[in-house]
């Protein structure tokens, strides 16, 4: 099972990722973690990334795709993986598609968590209020203002991926505003359907 998770910040991707990992025993691949691991392991791509990061540059799409390519060759990813946080742009998606095609690997689905942005901002504001009421510090990115900025960035940069993957026939939308356990049930039903198709 090879899937990509899409959805704006606050849509519950992290929670659902954890549950997918637990149920299907496939690793969640975070580009940040993979980048750090490649740098620490001093792989050829990792050394290239390290030099760029040390000079204050941004790691190119080609390097990130190279790191993903190395990571999915590892034993724990042989039966599948979840990509969360990558790709972020249509260009990255195209580069990822080309790399997977070279390896003869096909994605099973791109799962997009669809949310009501107004309700999402309300949810974040409520969480910030409850945190402050408990006398705990509110995380900077948990304030409605910062959250709206993150939502705007997502809409501009990552939302076009929805159209791109819809065009490939891989996109599956799930209502991310339902209670967490209901969303998990919807995700499970979807992914179990793919497993049955693959094994029949």
Curated annotation (Swiss-Prot):
User: Region labeled NMP — which residues?
Assistant: 30-59
Residues recorded as binding ATP, renumbered to this chain, are 10-15, 127, 178
Do you know which InterPro entries this protein is assigned to? Adenyl_kin_sub, Adenylat/UMP-CMP_kin, Adenylat_kinase_CS, P-loop_NTPase
Q: Known EC number(s)?
A: 2.7.4.3
Q: Which molecular function terms from Gene Ontology are attached?
A: adenylate kinase activity; ATP binding
Q: Among the record's GO biological process terms, what is one? A: AMP salvage
Q: Provide the residue span(s) of the region labelled LID.
A: 126-142
PROSITE patterns for this protein: ADENYLATE_KINASE
User: Which keywords, in A-to-Z order, does the entry hold?
Assistant: ATP-binding, Cytoplasm, Kinase, Nucleotide biosynthesis, Nucleotide-binding, Transferase
Q: How does it assemble?
A: Monomer.
What family, per the record?
A: Belongs to the adenylate kinase family.
Domain note: Consists of three domains, a large central CORE domain and two small peripheral domains, NMPbind and LID, which undergo movements during catalysis. The LID domain closes over the site of phosphoryl transfer upon ATP binding. Assembling and dissambling the active center during each catalytic cycle provides an effective means to prevent ATP hydrolysis.
Q: What is this protein called?
A: Adenylate kinase
The protein's organism comes out as Methylorubrum extorquens (strain PA1) (Methylobacterium extorquens)
